[in-house]
Amino acid sequence: MVPVGTKIISIPTSTTEQPIQLSPSPSDETISNAYAVVWVDSEDKIIVRKPAGISGTAVSELAYDQRGIILTGSSTRLGSSTWVEIYAPTGGTGWVNFWYLTEDVPPARFCEDLRVNALLETFVSGLINHDGETLTRVVNPKRGLILRHDWWNPEVLYSTSSVSSIYSDLSEIDWGVLGGSDFHILGSFREIILPQLEDVFLISPEVKCNEMIAGVTTQVAVWPREFDNMNFYVFHRPSPEGGNKYDWRTWAIGIEYVENQPYISVLIQYRGDI
């Protein structure tokens, strides 16, 4: 199960690699086995139910930014969704849809994890070489790869099985609309998204961990609230010195852990608007 409104995409050369400079890590610590809530709007909550399923009785609830959730170890498959049993914050146990949980990794520990550095370097290598197989290895096996042309535009989801063909598939996709207009952004990943990724990653961008970098814009550039518990890296190409102050671009990469291994879940673009 994926969030309502998410567009699901399922689709049946080489240059010199430029390393991205990331903060060094002193250690590779064991990640906590607790979970946190993701993909829930700041105005919403997750209902904890018993038994599992949307028809189960509500026994508790989780806030959109709830952390420290412990699983009992029991799970069940209901249709296309996996439900897991948790220890409810109000006591006892109950069930929630596993899509809305992520392994709870403290931000400071995340920013010191050397495996994340290696993950991002592999991602950049796959991007530079247009290598879908390499990209597949770094994408979240639980979710696939989710992209937003702009942070406020709808999500487009590439299933795990379709990521390997992301560079070669030319199917037209609706990526949302241009800011302040009804003009839809239509085209393939290769036509629309790839040039905008290369605009940032083929240079030596500014890099921050769990911190946004943005230039001049009429809309505040923010990491979406529904991803408050998801760690991220930001890569920023500033506007040219003495040039158009709106001509900048940032890509934020949301990273989650699956069985204690980091994977890329989300790519979100930020850019100047006039």
Which ranges hold each PLM region?
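SH3/SH3-like beta-barrel superfamily modules
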Residues: 61-99
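Boundary regions of SH3-family modules and the immediately adjacent low-complexity/disordered segments
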Residues: 2-32, 87-111
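Short alpha-helix capping/helix-loop boundary micro-motifs
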Residues: 52-57
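Short solvent-exposed beta->alpha transition segments
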Residues: 117-118, 136-226
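Short, low-complexity N-terminal intrinsically disordered segments enriched in polar/charged residues
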Residues: 103-125, 129, 137, 148-151
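Short beta-strand edge/turn micro-motifs at domain boundaries
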Residues: 94-100, 200-274
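Sec/Tat-exported extracytoplasmic proteins
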Residues: 66, 72, 123-131, 139-143
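Extracytoplasmic
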Residues: 33, 43, 81-83, 250
